[in-house]
Amino acid sequence: MPIVNVKLLEGRSDEQLKNLVTEVTNAVEKTTGANKEAIQIVIEEMKASHYGVAGVRKSDQ
């Protein structure tokens, strides 16, 4: 049972997140041969203030 965790900055629409789940599921099915019914996608949205690169938070850019 593949479980895919996706972390991204908040701000996407519900439609975008729905499409993300569909497309990731299709990609996992195609590349691993797993049944769609067994594939789980977990989306975690982060605030820009909770994510940083090179010592700088995204909210400070």
Curated annotation (Swiss-Prot):
Enzyme nomenclature, EC number: 5.3.2.-
Annotated InterPro entries: 4-OT, 4-OT-like_dom, Tautomerase/MIF_sf
Listed GO MF terms: isomerase activity
Coiled coil location: none
Disulfide bond annotation, renumbered to this chain: none
Key word Isomerase present: yes
Gene3D superfamilies linked: Macrophage Migration Inhibitory Factor (3.30.429.10)
Active-site positions on this chain: 2
Keywords attached to this entry: Isomerase
Isomerase in keyword set: yes
Pfam families from the UniProt entry: Tautomerase
PANTHER family in the cross-refs: 2-HYDROXYMUCONATE TAUTOMERASE, TAUTOMERASE-RELATED
Family statement drawn from the similarity comment of this UniProt entry: Belongs to the 4-oxalocrotonate tautomerase family.
Name by which UniProt lists this protein: Probable tautomerase SSP1389
Organism of origin: Staphylococcus saprophyticus subsp. saprophyticus (strain ATCC 15305 / DSM 20229 / NCIMB 8711 / NCTC 7292 / S-41)
Lineage: Bacteria, Bacillati, Bacillota, Bacilli, Bacillales
